[in-house]
Amino acid sequence: MAGDPLLPALHTGVERLGLTLPEGAAEALITYLRLLERWNRAYNLSAIRDPGEMLHRHLLDSLSILPYVEGDSLLDVGSGAGLPGIPLALARPGLTVTLLDSNGKKQRFTRQVALELGLHRLRFAQARLADYRPGQPFDTVVSRAFAALSGYVPEALRLCRAGGRVLAMKGRLPEEELAALPRSLRGCTLTALDVPGVAGQRHLLTWTAPAVSATEEANP
């Protein structure tokens, strides 16, 4: 949204992240934020109410993982209001993003965002993670504070193509959650994220899917 007072802060944050956005993406991100702000008053989509705080803790936090997204298809598990999936879709127009969430109210919001912003590569799936059976595996599967790792990682690997990436966005390093995983799944890559305007710790955990995923076995 041109002329929005939050636009300079977004540009500064994106620069600090070392990213370059395609033309029009910054304005579209602000439009998305304003839609979230407006819908949030009635539908309680986010506990964060202040738009400036939303910019840092939602938009920039989501964009911070852009360099770690692999391939052309991404599944956002427990996407809620579309985070991180919608910011990633706006920042990388060639990316096909599927938003998976069991909450119909939140899916109605994200569908409206897709309509208003012309996000034709955005897909929607209303289901629980354990019940979701896509036709094809994804290049990247991501969750943002969705659930404990033990309930996420095995299912995410099932939905990821061979050699693809499973990403989990967390605050503090979840040592207890990692310890609760089967031994074969504890070997992940840990990355500390420096998100502009976010004081607390942010971590990205990355797993590489094995040679043949469960979805590929079921759909040879």
Swiss-Prot record:
Pfam family, one: GidB
Signal peptide: none
Gene Ontology CC annotation, any one: cytosol
The organism of origin for this protein: Alkalilimnicola ehrlichii (strain ATCC BAA-1101 / DSM 17681 / MLHE-1)
One Gene Ontology term of the molecular function aspect: rRNA (guanine-N7-)-methyltransferase activity
Protein name: Ribosomal RNA small subunit methyltransferase G
EC number, as in UniProt: 2.1.1.170
Catalytic reaction equation(s): guanosine(527) in 16S rRNA + S-adenosyl-L-methionine = N(7)-methylguanosine(527) in 16S rRNA + S-adenosyl-L-homocysteine
Function: Specifically methylates the N7 position of guanine in position 527 of 16S rRNA.
Keywords, alphabetical: Cytoplasm, Methyltransferase, rRNA processing, S-adenosyl-L-methionine, Transferase
